[in-house]
Amino acid sequence: MSLYYIDGNSLTLDMIGRITADKEARVALSEEASARCRATRAQIDRWMEKDAPVVYGVNTGLGNLKDVVVPPEKHIEWNKTLPYPHAAGMGEYLPPEVTLTSLLLRANVLARGYSGVRPELIERILSIYNAKVAPAVHSEGSTGLSDLGPLAQNVMTVAGLDEAKAYYRGNLLPSREALRLAGLAESFTLECKEVLAQMNGSTMTQAIAVLAFLRFEELASGIEARLSSGGELPEFYEGCREVIGFTKGVLNRENNISCDNPLLFELPKGGYEAVMGCNCSNTQVGYAMDMMNTVLAELANGLHEKTGGLAKSEARHLLNKIKTCAMQVSADSIPTKGGQEDHVEFSFTAARKFYYAVELTGKLLAL
């Protein structure tokens, strides 16, 4: 069995690829990360006292209810209701590999310590990941500015709420049953800010993008071999290579960011301050996904030209579908949350299109 530690700073695409490929791999929280989380969690507990200042997301409502103060004695009960209004979704479920990877990525985000959650929560998430209990998450319903809907559905499985569902050993089950069969506690009590800290980020988008990119890397050598002529690649491939390298850098960086709002920063004289900087945004991944979809359309053109015979018709069909994925998504923006979230980048849609386009490119390469 291979054991990997996450610390919020060093989770790379290559590491995710190794963990995903190794069915016996296990992931744990590093001691250093655990200590950081305990320090910031102590500050959250202090803000739950009656004479504490008003801190968004800790003792207030969310979104356009940001100015509504929630008394400490009501907060735990209110906290339990948070996933429900956000966990709306439509469409088929995302692939289990996506939601599993989102658990790993979210645990790494929280391990940085800036969100103020207990280490026990991160350990709970990792135990679910290690047991391969994949939350059932609808594929429609996120703008990419914080994957609130998809991540709220993750939260419901982590907490073991009655309405949640999950995949376990190929079967779709109520989450509590899946957790029990995996040898885990059926429920887990989420404390102050721990629902928000799990929902408030674009981690489902990141998971889709990461898995699609890893799959693309698996196809890359085959694409190069098909496109080469006399050992030389076409000139346009160098431009593709630039975008591929840029995207890998973006995804590696985004694996290890503090994707939450607010974040806790240590003060020079001790204690922490809560900083509201909308760090739930994922604009850069949306841009990278749009560029990669353009790259795939270009590569698919080349693969199509190398395909002959009876397969030509199938190749044209696949090429057309890949090209439709190259239509830009992240240039759009429609305000949400009563106008409180006034810029959304739809990176979730861009990442899903990339995931699909990679799948189509694999089929085209196989012709």
What are these model-predicted stretches?
Residues V54-V68, V137-G160, Q198-M204, I208-L219, ...:
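Conserved phosphate/anionic-ligand binding catalytic regions in large, soluble enzymes, centered on
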Residues T283-L367:
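C-terminal catalytic subdomain
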Residues A35-V54, I125-S139, E186-T189, L267-A274:
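Short, hydrophobic/aliphatic alpha-helical segments
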Residues A87, G91-P95, T99-E224:
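Active-site cavity-forming subdomains of large catalytic enzyme subunits
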Residues M199-A207, L267-M276, G338-F346:
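Short, charged/polar, low-complexity loop and linker segments
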Residues S221, A225-H304:
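Accessory "access/gating" subregions that flank catalytic or transport cores
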